[in-house]
């Protein structure tokens, strides 16, 4: 009833809206039927049979016999006799008077005048102009282009299929060799020599173009399939039951009574009376009177008059007239350089030689023969 009222109200509202605005209502949504999901119970778990574990008791421990320890008493200490120390008095000091000082005689100094200086004659220097430089003519270098590289013909590699594997007890896997690599042709490099530089009046360096690289022939790799695995026969394991445990009875315990203690009586203590002290009377002190002082009278002072001064007259000055002047050197300018430049000759490199190489043929892959069972 409620749904009918809702439907009637919606129809009236739609008719009013269509009458006023001429709008159409959207169609009702289409609900597709979907069947209810089917739930399946999981399968019951499969319980595998496992045999009960077998417990083995450990073997009994083996107790080894150890004899009782033997105790030994330590030996008595040994006391050594040490005699009493002997004290000696130090000897009396001996006093000596110091010897009188000795004064040495030193003669008066002698003064000497220095010798006059000696002046050596040195001639005037002579200047020479350097010679003009000599330049030699050197022809320009001739550059040659390197020869083109020579490429040798190499036949295409031949691949052989591997031999069929031999099967032992089980079909072995089939190994296929990889296809051969494809080598693309690359033209040989062309080396061009640089143009010669123009240098005036200097020997130009000689440039040599590097030789072309030599390409060595390397044969193509040969791929071999690995040999089939060899399965060796292994016999089934043999299980041996463990031997029955052997119970060794421990040996009877023998108790040895300890040896009776030995009481060593200490040796009797012998007391030695110390020797009577010896009193050494010190020797009588003998006082020696110091010797009487000796007064050395100094030698009489002798005054020597200094030697009369010697006046050396300087040598007479000798005036040498200067040498006559030399003729002035006239510097001659070098001749003007002759700039000779030969015409530059450029050699074009020779055309490259293209050797014939056969067209690339597709590799025909051969499948290995079927295995023999």
UniProtKB/Swiss-Prot annotation:
UniProt subcellular location: Secreted, Primary cell wall
Keyword annotations from UniProtKB, A to Z: Cell wall, Cell wall biogenesis/degradation, Glycoprotein, Hydroxylation, Repeat, Secreted, Signal
Sequence repeats: 25-33, 34-40, 41-49, 50-56, 57-65, 66-72, 73-81, 82-88, 97-105, 106-112, 113-121, 122-128, 129-137, 138-144, 145-153, 154-160, 161-169, 170-176, 177-185, 186-192, 193-201, 202-208, 209-217, 218-224, 225-233, 234-240, 241-248, 249-256, 257-264, 265-272, 273-280, 281-288, 289-296, 297-304, 305-312, 313-320
Domain of life: Eukaryota
Record PTM text: Extensins contain a characteristic repeat of the pentapeptide Ser-Pro(4). For this particular extensin, a typical repeat of Ser-Pro(3) is found. In both cases, the proline residues are hydroxylated and then O-glycosylated (arabinosylation).
Tissue expression profile of the protein: Predominantly expressed in the roots. Not detected in the leaves, nor in flowers or flower buds. Wounding reverses this pattern, turning on the gene in the leaves and repressing it in the roots.
Region 13 X 7 AA repeats of S-P-P-P-V-Y-K: start-end pairs: 34-240
A GO biological-process term: plant-type cell wall organization
Residue ranges, annotated region (Disordered): 349-373
Region (5 X 8 AA repeats of S-P-P-P-P-V-H-Y): 241-312
GO molecular function: structural constituent of cell wall
Coiled-coil residues: none
Signal peptide: 1-19
Region listing for 5 X 8 AA repeats of S-P-P-P-V-V-Y-H, in residue ranges: 249-320
Annotated stretches, region: Isodityrosine cross-linking: 329-332, 363-366
Keyword field contains Transmembrane: no
A cellular-component GO term for this protein: extracellular region
Role description: Structural component which strengthens the primary cell wall.
Protein name: Extensin-1
Gene (name only): EXT1
């Amino acid at each position: 009833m409620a749904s009918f009222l809702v439907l009637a109200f919606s129809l009236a509202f739609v008719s009013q809206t269509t009458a006023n605005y001429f709008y159409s209502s959207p169609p009702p949504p289409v609900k597709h039927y979907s069947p209810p999901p089917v739930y399946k119970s999981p399968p019951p778990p499969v319980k595998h049979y496992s045999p009960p574990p077998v417990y083995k008791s450990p073997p009994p421990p083996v107790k080894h016999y150890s004899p009782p320890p033997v105790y030994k008493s330590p030996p008595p200490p040994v006391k050594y006799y040490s005699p009493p120390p002997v004290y000696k008095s130090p000897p009396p000091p001996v006093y000596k008077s110091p010897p009188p000082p000795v004064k040495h005689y030193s003669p008066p100094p002698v003064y000497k005048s220095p010798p006059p200086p000696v002046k050596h004659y040195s001639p005037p220097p002579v200047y020479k102009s350097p010679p003009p430089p000599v330049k030699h003519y050197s022809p320009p270098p001739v550059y040659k282009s390197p020869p083109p590289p020579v490429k040798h013909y190499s036949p295409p590699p031949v691949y052989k299929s591997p031999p069929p594997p031999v099967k032992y007890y089980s079909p072995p896997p089939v190994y296929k060799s990889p296809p051969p690599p494809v080598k693309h042709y690359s033209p040989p490099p062309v080396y061009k020599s640089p143009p010669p530089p123009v240098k005036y009046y200097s020997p130009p360096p000689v440039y040599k173009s590097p030789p072309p690289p030599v390409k060595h022939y390397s044969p193509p790799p040969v791929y071999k399939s690995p040999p089939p695995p060899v399965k060796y026969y292994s016999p089934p394991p043999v299980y041996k039951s463990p031997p029955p445990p052997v119970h060794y009875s421990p040996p009877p315990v023998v108790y040895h009574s300890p040896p009776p203690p030995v009481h060593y009586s200490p040796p009797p203590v012998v007391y030695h009376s110390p020797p009577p002290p010896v009193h050494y009377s010190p020797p009588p002190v003998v006082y020696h009177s110091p010797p009487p002082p000796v007064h050395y009278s100094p030698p009489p002072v002798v005054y020597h008059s200094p030697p009369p001064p010697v006046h050396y007259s300087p040598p007479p000055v000798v005036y040498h007239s200067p040498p006559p002047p030399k003729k002035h050197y006239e510097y001659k300018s070098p001749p003007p350089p002759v700039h000779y430049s030969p015409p530059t000759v450029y050699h074009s490199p020779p055309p490259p030689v293209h050797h014939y190489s056969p067209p690339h043929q597709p590799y025909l892959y051969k499948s290995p023969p079927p295995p023999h069972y």
